[in-house]
Amino acid sequence: VEILPIANLLTMCMFGFILCHELAHHNLGHIYEASHKQQELNADTQGFQYLKRVSHQFEQLEFLKIPPNILGAPVIAMIYLQALEAIGIISISGDTHPSVPQRIQNLYEQFNKAADKEARYLYNGLRLSCVEFIDEMNKMKNASC
């Protein structure tokens, strides 16, 4: 497996999900209300549905290439955020956003409904690499203390 093309697709899908998430906030009318945790989960869910729709148009779109087998990318992005939060680099959870584990669970449920065998295989490999990466980050953090 060539890493660079997968990394490129993964990055594009993560970025695409962020855009879809923000579009979902707009379409769900969240921009007119005070932000709260359920809105974020709703925007994650709707944003994933938008991303899935884009992935189903993979063959028709000339430049936007998000194949269905990379739909686990939003979950992987949240796992990255969880790792950064765990070692104290960022803080995401608060009054307006649900915990990262809640968002991972919500997005994983969406992914699991949509994923085929190839998407699950790729997701599992990426998830396991995240686990190794998080372990290494924790070792480096502990070594510097």
Over which residues does each language-model region extend?
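Long, well-structured alpha-helical subdomains associated
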Residues: 53-145
